[in-house]
Each structure stands twice: as C-alpha cells, then as structure tokens.
Amino acid sequence: MYLLDMSVGANIVLSSIIACNASVKFGYAGLIIAPLICGTIIGLINGIVYIKLHISSLIVTCALSLIYEALSVYTTNGKNVILSTEYRAFGDYPVNLILALIAYFLCAFILKYTKIGIYTYAIGSNEVVAKNMGVNVSKYKIVAF
C-alpha cells in the first residue's frame, strides 16, 4: 500500500512560522533548530496516528494538515510573519536553494548508506517480505513520516 503525506505544505508553513518566531528570541540557533524540532514532531504525530488508527495515510495526513494550518493561523493571528533581514545570510540570494541542495544530499546519503534507508526501501518494495525479514515495519513507517 502506498503511503502519501499530504501535510507537507502545512508542515513547512507551521515550521517556518515557528522558525521566524524563534529567531526573534534565540537568533540563528532558533532559526535552525526550531523548524527541525517542529517538523520532527509533526512527522511523529502523522506516523503515530497512521499506525495506531489503521486509517489510510492520505486521509490521516489530509486531516492533520487542516489542523496544522489552523495552528499556523492561530499562531500568527492571521497576519504575515516576515523574517528579519539580519538573518538573511546571502542577502537576496535564495539561500533556500543552498539549504535544499544540502538537504537533498543528506537524504540521499541516509537512504543509500544507512539501515533506516535500506529498511525504507525494503518496506516500499514489499512490506510483507520486509516484515518476514525481521524489519519492524510499524517503527520504520513512523520514522519515514
């Protein structure tokens, strides 16, 4: 069965809002660490709800996406959140491109050379065979979210 995560956009929005708010209080450290923690918690919630309730991942993540979007609006009181110019490392150059490339290579490394990546490929190829090989399928599905 295919696993689809429809909450990625809401995850990015909520993590970005948290990052902007954290940068005001904690500087660069908050700007980097806060969205990582927020995204991890959101992924953990998605995975646990999917595994425990045995509902399609499409439905679970779509419903949770609405909750995350509502939290985003509640957090900002419906107003725009803008990152301070002092935290824009390369001025107007899209630092997102650099960060996206770093994230891509990191994820590619994890998927190709670690146990988590190998198990993820095994579960994606054939979940029954992966389970028969001794892979804790539920655990690695949660990690994948």
PLM feature segments, named:
Residues 1-25, 48-51:
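Single transmembrane alpha-helix segments in multi-pass membrane proteins
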Residues 2-4, 26-27, 53-55, 114, ...:
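Membrane-helix interface residues
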Residues 13-17, 39-40, 65-66, 104, ...:
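Residue-level recognition of pore/gate-forming positions within transmembrane alpha-helices
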Residues 16-17, 63-73, 129-134:
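Small-residue-rich segments of transmembrane alpha-helices in multi-pass membrane proteins
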Residues 17-22, 44-48, 70-71, 104-109:
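Alpha-helical transmembrane segments of multipass membrane proteins
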Residues 26-65:
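Alpha-helical transmembrane segments within multi-pass membrane transporters and channels
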Residues 29, 33-35, 41-46, 93-145:
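Helix-loop-helix "hairpin" substructures at the membrane interface of multi-pass membrane proteins
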Residues 53, 57-115, 140-143:
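Transmembrane helix-bundle core of multi-pass membrane transporters
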